C-alpha cells in the first residue's frame, strides 16, 4: 500500500456574527477556516486530517511536500512522522498530516484510532465550557450561569485585559455567582502573542505571580498559558511558586520542546495539540512522560 494522491480543501464556515478571540486582540473573526487533507492510497483507501487554515501557504503544500510523501506506506507511522519532521523547514509545521495516516491504518485494520492507541471502550470524559472572548466581569458571570443551566460543571474563563485588576475582578465575579457549584479554569492566552492592534496586554512573571495568588483565593483549578510559550525558565519558576496548577503547551511543536519543558518543570498540566505539537506520535510521548512524572495531561483540541 502506498500514498497515491494528496488533496487539500480550504473550508470556510461563516459565523452568525463577529467573534473577537481573546488570543488575537483586535481581530473581528467572521469566518471559521480550516484546511482539510485527503490522502488516497493506490488501493483506494482514504484518510482524512484537518489543520489550521493558512490558505496561502497551504495552497502549494501538495506540490511542496507531496514528493516527500507520494509512494510511502501510510501505515508506517514512524517513518511518516520522521519524514514530516524532516520537511518542516519547508514551511509551517505539518504534523497534522500524520492523522490522515492513522485514519488509513485504522480502516485497514478495521479499528478506530483510539483502539490503535490502546484506549479502552466505555470510558467517559467530562467536558467543560470554554469562553472565547474577553467580557466585563458581570457580563461574564451571567454567561457562566447560563452555561451552568445547560449542564456544564466546569468553565474556562478568558483574561486578557490591560488592567490586571479587571482580570481578577472577572474571576471573583464568576466565583461569587456560581459559589462552589462549578469548577473554574482561566486562560490568559499569553503563549501566542499575535495582535492586530498596536498594543496588547502582555504578561511578565510578576503579573502572572500576582494573578496566580488571586486565583488561589477563588479556588481556580488551573491557569493556562500565563507566559510566552518559550519562556521555559519563567514558567518553571511560576509553577514552583503558584498554588494553582499551571497549564500550557498547545502551541509548542515536537517532542524536543516538550522534553525541555518537562526537564525544567515548566508546567503542572501539559496540553500538547496533535495537529501542531508533533502529531499523535509526539503527543503520545508527552503522555507517557507525564505519567512517569505524575503530571497531568489534557491534550488541546
Name the predicted role of every residue range.
Residues 3, 44, 65, 97, ...:
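Conserved, mostly hydrophobic/aromatic
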Amino acid at each position: 500500500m502506498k500514498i497515491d494522491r494528496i488533496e487539500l480543501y480550504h473550508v470556510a464556515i461563516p459565523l452568525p456574527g463577529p467573534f473577537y478571540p481573546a488570543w488575537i486582540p483586535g481581530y473581528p473573526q467572521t469566518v471559521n477556516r480550516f484546511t482539510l487533507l485527503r490522502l488516497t492510497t493506490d488501493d483506494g483507501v482514504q484518510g482524512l486530517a484537518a489543520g489550521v487554515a493558512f490558505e496561502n501557504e497551504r495552497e502549494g503544500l501538495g506540490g511542496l511536500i507531496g514528493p516527500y510523501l507520494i509512494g510511502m506506506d501510510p501505515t508506517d507511522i514512524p517513518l511518516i512522522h520522521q519524514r514530516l519532521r524532516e520537511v518542516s523547514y519547508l514551511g509551517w509545521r505539518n504534523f497534522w498530516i500524520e492523522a490522515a495516516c492513522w485514519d488509513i491504518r485504522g480502516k485497514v485494520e478495521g479499528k478506530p484510532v483510539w483502539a490503535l492507541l490502546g484506549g479502552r471502550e466505555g470510558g467517559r470524559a467530562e467536558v467543560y465550557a470554554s469562553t472565547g472572548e474577553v467580557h466585563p466581569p458581570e457580563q461574564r458571570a451571567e454567561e457562566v450561569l447560563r452555561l451552568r443551566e445547560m449542564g456544564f460543571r466546569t468553565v474556562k474563563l478568558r483574561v486578557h485585559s490591560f488592567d490586571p485588576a479587571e482580570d481578577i475582578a472577572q474571576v471573583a465575579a464568576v466565583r461569587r455567582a456560581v459559589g462552589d457549584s462549578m469548577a473554574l479554569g482561566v486562560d490568559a492566552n499569553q503563549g501566542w502573542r499575535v495582535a492586530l492592534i498596536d498594543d496588547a496586554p502582555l504578561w511578565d512573571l510578576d503579573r502572572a505571580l500576582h494573578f496566580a495568588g488571586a486565583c488561589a483565593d477563588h479556588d481556580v483549578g488551573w491557569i493556562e498559558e500565563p507566559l510566552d510559550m518559550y519562556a521555559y525558565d519563567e514558567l518553571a519558576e511560576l509553577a514552583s511558586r503558584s498554588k494553582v496548577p499551571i497549564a500550557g503547551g498547545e502551541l509548542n511543536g515536537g517532542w524536543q520542546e516538550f522534553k525541555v519543558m518537562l526537564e525544567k518543570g515548566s508546567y503542572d498540566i501539559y496540553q500538547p495539540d496533535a495537529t501542531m505539537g508533533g502529531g499523535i506520535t509526539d503527543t503520545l510521548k508527552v503522555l507517557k512522560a507525564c505519567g512517569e512524572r505524575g503530571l497531568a495531561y489534557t491534550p488541546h483540541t
